[in-house]
Amino acid sequence: RGPEAAMPEKPVFEIVKDRYISMEDNVHLPLLYMTYPTVSLRHEDEAPLDVLSSILGGGKTSLLYKNLVKTQFAVQAQVGHPCAELSCTFSLLALPHPASGKSLADVEKIIRDTLVEFEQRGVEEDDLLKVKAEMEASFVFGLQSVSGKVSQLAANQTFSNNPNYIAQDIARYNNVTKEDVMRVFKKYIKDQHGVIMSVVPDGQLNSISAENNFVPGPRSAGGESSTSADELAVRKGTDSFDRSLIPPSGATEAVDIPEMWRRNFDNGISILGTQSLETPTTSLLLKISAGHYFNAKDKAGTAALLASMFGESTTERSAEEMSKALQKLGSSVTISAGNHYLNVN
């Protein structure tokens, strides 16, 4: 066992004025990326900031979607509040639509105007209902796979010294109030300074959002170690078996297959089902014989186009209304086209 490792200090960042930076890349569309330093993992303000990010840029009911994507000024716009081991950042990004004629500077102004709109609009009750349902659902759905269980247990043990921290995590988000969201908005985002990065296609530096006013310094990982291999005390493990011998093979492990049931109806519909009690969730998969193999030879891509259109407005609901209803349930519907089937999941 090595020496005990102390928890590192959580750094506190302060940016005294907006830092504009840019880079060229082998990309087709330009990108505007705005980020603000916030708090650390599981800080009391982390959950309200997560809720704020969802209100501003989470799905088709968000403000940025309304002001950028629905207006066809951008092909993508989103907001996130990711956390690493020691710190979190509040990030807003958008990719201008090439046919809109909007520059990165225009997109930045729309984003800043959206923040002003949010302050005037405030937090609505539906905002909290949607975000809290989505957050709880993401925790629960994350437990449906072995990797999801292991990841959550390991992360909770590492950062909270409690592998079963999921209940406290869900409670953190359920306890967020409208006042909490407005408080963190005014503390970390409103009138605060951040880093604004323009990523543009090669040779288009003239299209950046604003002139660069900051040059990042060289990154250093510290001085090189002068320790030689001869100075290291090697601890050799002791085996209780002979590694030169191939172990004998045992009996094949039986696979625990869930019990399935099937029902065939007179109209030709067949249902295959099973029950799992690991999580309180229900999953439905509808398979329709309308995949790529059913396309006419001169109309390749029709199935994929149909699948995409199913996610848009219907005669009874707009795309925003569908998204809002699903978010309040903590549910999702995905439609995709495979070779044989159109899949509704």
PLM regions with names:
Residues 62:
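Conserved active-site loop region of the serine DD-peptidase/beta-lactamase
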Residues 29-40, 66-175, 195-200, 207-211, ...:
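M16 family metallopeptidases and their MPP-like homologs
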Residues 1-24, 66, 167-287:
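Proteolytic maturation boundary segments
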Residues 54:
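Phosphate-interacting basic helix/loop segments used at nucleotide- and nucleic-acid interfaces
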Residues 46-47:
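Zinc-dependent metallopeptidase catalytic helix centered on the HExxH motif
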